[in-house]
Amino acid sequence: MKRKLVDFCIISLPQHNERRDKLKNEMAKYDIECRVSHAIDGRKLLAEKYFSLFKIRSSKMFGRGFLTPSELGCFLSHKKALTEFLASGRKWLVVLEDDVLPKENVKYLDEMINSFCSSSVYILGGQDGLKSFSRVIMGRKSICGVRKVILGTHRWLYRTCCYCVDIKGAERILRLMEENSFFCDDWSYIVRNAKLDNVFYGQYFSHPLNLNSSSIEAERLFIAEK
């Protein structure tokens, strides 16, 4: 596939120069050029903005009905990246958060995307260290380097650190984001309410096991302790 049809986008807070440069350099080794979409730091939102958007209708986090500041920032950052993609004229979007690292098979990803299905979401890895991933059931047959997630077990997939959608899928997700807020990695809610056709999974990127630098994780731990 001609790369001009694929938008490889790194979501990164402006101050995280080192992290995004490392990822850009790693991707460049496989002849993949990435653009940067500067993330929105939810901790710096005005109170009026935060309280107008923090309530959610569906929750993966033990019934919690609101987003923390960093979770809302994540939501708005992905919404921004999707909006930028739809204005770009490209056909496919690969979203990467700046803490992932590519596996060697990422060199085939561009070619594989050419055979991906429309109106679906492709989770490209990033489940490292998550016990929930053992509950995900996938088809045995690997097509285009990915396997279909079946029996509704995509509810056990977490993180938005690496995924791929086409124009139709992006439009549907963005439309849902315009309607209300939700956890960015609530894939069950997204697939159901954005009316996406399928979820596929492939191992193209890894996520660090150490989450000490994650503001989202810090806020979740703070709430859990209360």
Where in the sequence are the language-model features?
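An acidic/histidine-cluster motif and surrounding catalytic segment
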Residues: 1-96, 100-226
